[in-house]
A protein has these predicted regions:
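A short, hydrophobic beta-strand/beta-hairpin element that forms part of a small beta-sheet core
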Residues: 13-17
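Single conserved hydrophobic/aromatic residue that forms the stacking wall/gate
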Residues: 1-9
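GST-like fold's C-terminal all-alpha helical module
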Residues: 55-152
Length: 166
């Protein structure tokens, strides 16, 4: 339950009492740390901690960012910058090499369990497939994301436009 008087998560915006957040990775981390403990967090004393932090940053800065530019120019401003849209799509696809390689011998990205890193990185794959950038589904990424997207919690989360709690 919210520690503030109300919690609201709506259209990628979190309000929890006096706390207001707009960045998705920060929101996920905040919720786990404020309302945990949670196995979704990799702690500093775990071997994969640095990798975990890197994947959290990688999810938005390296993977989701080029998709947002692609979304803008391929779907919202068609014809304005078609070359830029295709360039950002290619950039995104090239950045998947690291993820595909990481998943060669792993079920999850960090600490041999489902963590926030999986949630945050898989959003980029979900967005890519929503935009029909199906080239993102390299074999290991496809296996991993299928498992994540079949989780009951994922199905519940994607079945609603937003969640509001008072």
């Amino acid at each position: 339950r919210s520690r503030g008087s109300e919690m609201c998560i709506r259209d990628r915006y979190l309000k929890d009492g006096k706390v207001e957040m707009t960045e998705s990775v920060a929101m996920c981390t905040y919720l786990c740390e404020q309302y945990g403990p949670s196995d979704l967090i990799v702690s500093p004393d775990e071997d994969d901690y640095a990798d975990y932090l890197n994947w959290l940053a990688h999810s938005d800065a390296t993977l989701t960012f080029p998709l947002t530019v692609y979304l803008r120019y391929a779907l919202q401003e068609v014809g304005v910058a078609d070359a830029a849209a295709e360039g950002y799509k290619r950039w995104f696809l090239a950045r998947l090499r690291l993820l595909e390689k990481k998943l060669e011998s792993r079920e999850y990205l960090c600490s041999d369990r489902f963590t926030l890193a999986d949630i945050c990185v898989s959003y980029a794959i979900y967005l890519a497939t929503s935009l029909n950038v199906n080239e993102a589904l390299k074999p290991n990424i496809a296996r991993w994301s299928e498992k994540l997207f079949n989780r009951d919690a994922f199905k519940r989360a994607t079945s609603q436009r937003f969640i509001e709690e008072s």
